[in-house]
C-alpha cells in the first residue's frame, strides 16, 4: 500500500487527466456561483460580469470574482491563439502608423503651443504661466527624445543587437520623466524665491487678460484633444505622450487660475499655484521613473500572467506529462518567459523538439511576451539548473 501511494504521488498530474477547455471550466465555475453573483454575469458574454446589476456583494467579494473572471478571459485568449497561429500583420502595421501619427501631431502641437505660451508669459509676467511655458519647452525636448527612441527601435542591427532594441523604450521614458521632474524642481525654487522677495507685481491690463485667456484656453483644448487621442494607443511611448498631455491640461488650468486669482485678489496665489504644480510634477514623473526602472531589473510577472502561461503549457500537447516550472519576468517593456516541461523518456528527439519549439512559438504570440525559452526534460526531480545566488554578492564579511 505504501509503494502504491508513493507511485500515485509521483504519477504525472496530466497523464490520465482530460485537458479541460476554458469553456468547460467556465461552465463548471458558473454553475457553482451563488445567486447574487449569477445576476451580474453577462448572458451574451459569460466571461464578463457587471456587478452594478447585483446586490448584496461586499467589495472584497466583488474583487475576488472579478479576478476569477479575468483569469477565464485570459484563458480564452490562449485558446484563441491555439485556434489561429497567424498574427495579423495588417493590424500591426495599422497600429504602428497610428502611433507614429500620434507622435508627429503631438510634436507639432508642442511647437505651436510653446510659441503661444512664450507670448502669454511675456504679456502676463505670471510665474505660474512661466511654469507652464517651461513645461511646453521641455515637452518639445522630451518629445524629441521619445521620437528618437521610436526611430532607434525601428532600425535594428541583428548582429549588434541580437534581441532587438525594445529596452530603448523604457530608457527613453526614464530620460523623459527625469527631465520633467527636473523642471518641477526648478519651478519650485523660482516660486519660493518669489514668495521670499515679497514684491507685489503690477496688475494685468484687460488686453493682457484677453491674450492670457485666449492662449491658455486654446492650449488646454488642444492638449485635451491630444490626450483623448493618444491614450487609446497600445504603444507605450504614445501612452507616455498621453500622460504628458494630461499633465499639461492640469498645469494649464491650475496655471491660468493661479495667474488670474493672483491678479484679482492676492499676489501670492500665483507663486503658491506654481509650487503646487511643481510638487505635482516631481511626484508624478518620479513615479514614472521608478515604474520603468523596475521593468528593467527583472521583476516577476503577476500571478495572473503565470496562470495564463501555465494553462497554455498544460494544454499544448498530450505528450507533456508535467509542467515543472513557469517563470516570467520583465526585461524592458515585455516579459521574458521560461517554461520547463517533462516529456516521456522514450520520446524521439525529433518529436520532443517539435513540441518544445511549437510551445515556444505559441507563448511568443502572446502580446505581453517578447521572448520565450522552453526547456525539455524527462524528469522533474533534479536540482535547479541555474544557480542565481552564486552570482550575487556574498553577505558574508
From Swiss-Prot:
Statement: the UniProt record of this protein carries the keyword Translocase: no
One GO location term (cellular component): vacuolar membrane
Pfam family name, one: ZT_dimer
InterPro entries (UniProt xref): Cation_efflux, Cation_efflux_CTD, Cation_efflux_CTD_sf, Cation_efflux_TMD_sf, CDF_Transporter
Biased composition, class Basic and acidic residues, residue ranges: 1-19
Membrane-spanning intervals of the chain: 105-122, 127-147, 171-191, 209-229, 249-269, 271-291
Membrane topology: Multi-pass membrane protein
Subcellular location: Vacuole membrane
Domain of life: Eukaryota
UniProt GO MF annotations: manganese ion transmembrane transporter activity
Protein keywords: Ion transport, Membrane, Transmembrane, Transmembrane helix, Transport, Vacuole
Homology family: Belongs to the cation diffusion facilitator (CDF) transporter (TC 2.A.4) family. SLC30A subfamily.
Protein name from the UniProt record: Metal tolerance protein 4
Organism (species): Oryza sativa subsp. japonica (Rice)
Primary gene name: MTP4
Amino acid at each position: 500500500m505504501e509503494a502504491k501511494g508513493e507511485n500515485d504521488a509521483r504519477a504525472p498530474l496530466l497523464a490520465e487527466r482530460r485537458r479541460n477547455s476554458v469553456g468547460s471550466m467556465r461552465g463548471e465555475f458558473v454553475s457553482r456561483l451563488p445567486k447574487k453573483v449569477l445576476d451580474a454575469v453577462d448572458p451574451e458574454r459569460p466571461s464578463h460580469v457587471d456587478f452594478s446589476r447585483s446586490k448584496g456583494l461586499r467589495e472584497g467579494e466583488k474583487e475576488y470574482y472579478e479576478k476569477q473572471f479575468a483569469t477565464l478571459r485570459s484563458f480564452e485568449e490562449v485558446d484563441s491563439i491555439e485556434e489561429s497561429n497567424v498574427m495579423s500583420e495588417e493590424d500591426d502595421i495599422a497600429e504602428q502608423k497610428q502611433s507614429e501619427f500620434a507622435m508627429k501631431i503631438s510634436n507639432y502641437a508642442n511647437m505651436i503651443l510653446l510659441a503661444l505660451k512664450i507670448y502669454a508669459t511675456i504679456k502676463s509676467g505670471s510665474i505660474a504661466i512661466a511654469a507652464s511655458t517651461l513645461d511646453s519647452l521641455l515637452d518639445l525636448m522630451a518629445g524629441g527624445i521619445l521620437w528618437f527612441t521610436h526611430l532607434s527601435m525601428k532600425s535594428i542591427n541583428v548582429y549588434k543587437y541580437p534581441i532587438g532594441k525594445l529596452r530603448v523604450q523604457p530608457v527613453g521614458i526614464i530620460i523623459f520623466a527625469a527631465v520633467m521632474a527636473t523642471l518641477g524642481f526648478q519651478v519650485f525654487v523660482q516660486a519660493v524665491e518669489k514668495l521670499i522677495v515679497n514684491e507685489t507685481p503690477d496688475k494685468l491690463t484687460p488686453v493682457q487678460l484677453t491674450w492670457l485667456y485666449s492662449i491658455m484656453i486654446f492650449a488646454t483644448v488642444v492638449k485635451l484633444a491630444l490626450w483623448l487621442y493618444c491614450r487609446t494607443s497600445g504603444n507605450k511611448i504614445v501612452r507616455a505622450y498621453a500622460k504628458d498631455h494630461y499633465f499639461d491640461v492640469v498645469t494649464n488650468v491650475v496655471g491660468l487660475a493661479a495667474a488670474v486669482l493672483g491678479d484679482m485678489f492676492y499676489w501670492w496665489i500665483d507663486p503658491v499655484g506654481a509650487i503646487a504644480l511643481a510638487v505635482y510634477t516631481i511626484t508624478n514623473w518620479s513615479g514614472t521613473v521608478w515604474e520603468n526602472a523596475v521593468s528593467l531589473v527583472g521583476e516577476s510577472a503577476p500571478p495572473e500572467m503565470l496562470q495564463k502561461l501555465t494553462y497554455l503549457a498544460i494544454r499544448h500537447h498530450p505528450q507533456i506529462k508535467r509542467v515543472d516550472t513557469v517563470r516570467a519576468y520583465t526585461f524592458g517593456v515585455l516579459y521574458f518567459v521560461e517554461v520547463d516541461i517533462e516529456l516521456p523518456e522514450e520520446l524521439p528527439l525529433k518529436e520532443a523538439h517539435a513540441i518544445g519549439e511549437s510551445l515556444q512559438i505559441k507563448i511568443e504570440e502572446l502580446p505581453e511576451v517578447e521572448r520565450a525559452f522552453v526547456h525539455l526534460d524527462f524528469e522533474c526531480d533534479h536540482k535547479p539548473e541555474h544557480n542565481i545566488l552564486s552570482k550575487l554578492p556574498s553577505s558574508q564579511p
